[in-house]
Every structure is written in C-alpha cells, then in structure tokens.
C-alpha cells in the first residue's frame, strides 16, 4: 500500500523537484 501512494505522489513530486533544481542552479 505504501508503494501505491508513493508511486502516484512520485510523479507529482518529480515534476515539482525538477523546477526546484532549475531554480537552485
């Protein structure tokens, strides 16, 4: 069950993380 919400949240977090990384750079 933990992997289920982790996989769905991972997709959203991955997009937000990409923006944060570009801002940090």
Swiss-Prot record:
Alphabetical list of InterPro entries matching this protein: Ribosomal_eS32
Nucleotidyltransferase is among the record's keywords: no
Keywords: Ribonucleoprotein, Ribosomal protein
Pfam families: Ribosomal_L41 (PF05162)
Region of interest called Disordered, as start-end residue ranges on this chain: 1-25
Molecular function per GO: structural constituent of ribosome
A single cellular component GO annotation: ribosome
BP GO annotations: translation
UniProt record similarity statement: Belongs to the eukaryotic ribosomal protein eS32 family.
Subunit structure: Component of the large ribosomal subunit.
Extra facts: Initially thought to be part of the large ribosomal subunit. Crystal structures show eS32/eL41 to be a small ribosomal subunit forming a bridge at the interface of the 2 subunits.
Descriptive protein name: Small ribosomal subunit protein eS32
Lineage, uppermost ranks: Eukaryota, Fungi, Dikarya, Basidiomycota, Agaricomycotina
């Amino acid at each position: 069950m933990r992997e289920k919400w982790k996989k769905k949240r991972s997709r959203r977090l991955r997009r937000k993380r990409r923006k944060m990384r570009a801002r940090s750079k």
